[in-house]
Amino acid sequence: VRVKLNRFTGVCLLAFLCCSACQKGQEPSIAWYWWKTVYAPDSAELAYFNATGAKQLGVRLFDVDTSARYPFPSPKGILQQKQAWPDSVKLVPVVYITRAALLQPGSLDSLAVRIARLVGSLMKQSNWTEIQWDHDWTGSTRANYFALLRLLKQQAIFNNKTFAATIRLHQLRQTQPGLMPPVRKGLLMVYNMGHLTQAGNTNSILDEAVWKSYQSDLKKYPLPLDWAMPVFAWAVQFRQNRFVAILNGVRAKEVLASGLVDALPNGQYRCRKAGFLAGFGVQAGDVLRLEGADAATLEKIVRILRHERNDVQPTLYFFDWQNKHIPYFSSYDIQRISQAH
């Protein structure tokens, strides 16, 4: 009996060790980004938000940018809140900072004060514990950006607030001291990773070949990470192999319904005559490249993230919450993506 018991115990122990070895990271909670300048979701958008089981909402408050008229950094596209935030949802304000704003920022101290003042004004009626800073830093802006983050931390409005910063794929390899943002956690953007303006058969929103080239860096990145995935899509318009425009929100359905295009062998479309496609002007000979991601691709990415990362209670953001994406990602799709393992 004793031998049988030991064998049984050994089998159980082996099974436990095997399960532990292949244990996946925690299932992420669902969140959405609101990126429009007016917050006024309609009943269909609100119903969809609730149906996805979202627990968090990231809201872009404003951009920090320059202009020809006013060359110093100033707020652009300030959010207008027309209705109450969803009930029982964690609210996370987001501030987007352009590269131009940090190339010649003037006084960083003054900029930090002005940003803090505006955030405080926009969020004074809301409960929030975290703020995201969105900037795609490079060697030319990193020092100013990191200095600005440190100055922002000193502003009273941000006392006891969690600072998070967006992390692009190319920044996963910058793990040396001084090359990571001075924040508590990052938000890994799994989109906008390709060469948008270059002609060719690629997908600048989510290029799986580019994504795979960074998978070995996931485990090495020391900051805790939340994750962000794309549900948006667009068509990229080229004329004589030169970039013309982004046809925002245009998918295959609109392209085919236009009656203006012929399909090419590489999955792109050539316009055979001039006209308007989903409200966008096209010329004969223009080539349209459709970009985006489907639910199956996003599921694969979540599986990889859960396998490679040990983030505690990560949040999975979807970009972005609006009606035109709902037909392509059902609430079931969103839940299935977040539960992939």
What are these regions (language model features)?
Residues 38-50, 108-123, 171-176, 294-306:
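Short, acidic/polar
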Residues 22-49, 60:
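Boundary/entry segment of secreted carbohydrate-active catalytic domains
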Residues 232, 240-341:
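Substrate-binding cleft of secreted/luminal carbohydrate-active enzymes
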Residues 147-251:
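Substrate-binding surface in catalytic domains of secreted glycosidases
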Residues 43-66, 122-126:
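Catalytic domains of carbohydrate-active enzymes, especially glycoside hydrolases
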Residues 1-29:
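Bacterial Sec-dependent N-terminal signal peptides
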Residues 64-65, 69-182, 188:
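Chitinase-like catalytic core of GlcNAc-active glycosidases
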Residues 30-34, 55-59, 91-95, 131, ...:
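Hydrophobic faces of well-ordered beta-strands that scaffold small-molecule active sites
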